[in-house]
Regions:
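Sec-dependent bacterial lipoprotein signal peptides
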Residues: 1-21
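Generic, low-specificity signal for short hydrophobic/alpha-helical stretches with a mild N-terminal bias
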Residues: 5, 55-58, 104
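Flexible, polar/low-complexity N-terminal or interdomain linker segments that lie immediately upstream
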Residues: 13, 21-67
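Rhodanese-like catalytic fold shared by cysteine-dependent sulfurtransferases
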Residues: 23-39, 66-147
C-alpha cells in the first residue's frame, strides 16, 4: 500500500512539473505584439499624420467616455473584454467595425494593463503589430495635447 501511495505521489509531482509551469494567470492568453507610445505628443502627431485607414479607440467604460473623450474617438469599452475566448464580443465588435488593414490607436485609463491586453488581442486576431498602437499613460494626459 505504501509503495502504491509513493507511486501516485511521484506521478502527481511529475505531472505538475511537466504542466504546472505553463498555467500561470499572466500567460493564460498569448497576446500579439503592439506599438507603445509613452509621450502624448508623439502619439498625437503619429495619429494625425497617419495617411491610411485609422481609428482612435477609447477603451474606458461607457460612462467615462460619455463624460469626455478625444475628438474622433470611438468607444469600445475593455470592461466587456473576455481574455479566454477569441470570439469575445469585444473582438467581434472590433472586427465588424474595422477591417484588419485599419491602424488602431488605443487609449484608456492610467491602468495600462487593460489597454495593453486589448491592443495585444487586436494584434493577435489579425491587425498585427504595426496596426495595434497604444498610448500608455491614459486619457487625462492625452487630452492636454489633443486638438
Amino acid at each position: 500500500m505504501k509503495r502504491l501511495r509513493n507511486y501516485f505521489v511521484m506521478l502527481t509531482v511529475a505531472i505538475l512539473a511537466l504542466f504546472g509551469t505553463s498555467c500561470s494567470s499572466d500567460d493564460s492568453e498569448e497576446l500579439g505584439p503592439f506599438v507603445e507610445y509613452t509621450e502624448a505628443q508623439t502619439f498625437y502627431d503619429t495619429y494625425t499624420s497617419y495617411k491610411g485607414a485609422k481609428a482612435l479607440i477609447d477603451t474606458r467604460e461607457k460612462s467615462k467616455f460619455e463624460a469626455g473623450h478625444l475628438t474622433g474617438a470611438d468607444n469600445l469599452p475593455a470592461d466587456i473584454y473576455n481574455t479566454a475566448d477569441d470570439n469575445a464580443q469585444w473582438s467581434k465588435d472590433l472586427l465588424a467595425k474595422y477591417p484588419t488593414n485599419t491602424c488602431l490607436f488605443f487609449y484608456g485609463t492610467t491602468s495600462f494593463q487593460m489597454t495593453k491586453a486589448v491592443a495585444g488581442r487586436a494584434s493577435r486576431i489579425g491587425y498585427g503589430k504595426e496596426n495595434s498602437r497604444i498610448y500608455s499613460k491614459g486619457y487625462d494626459a492625452l487630452k492636454a495635447v489633443w486638438k
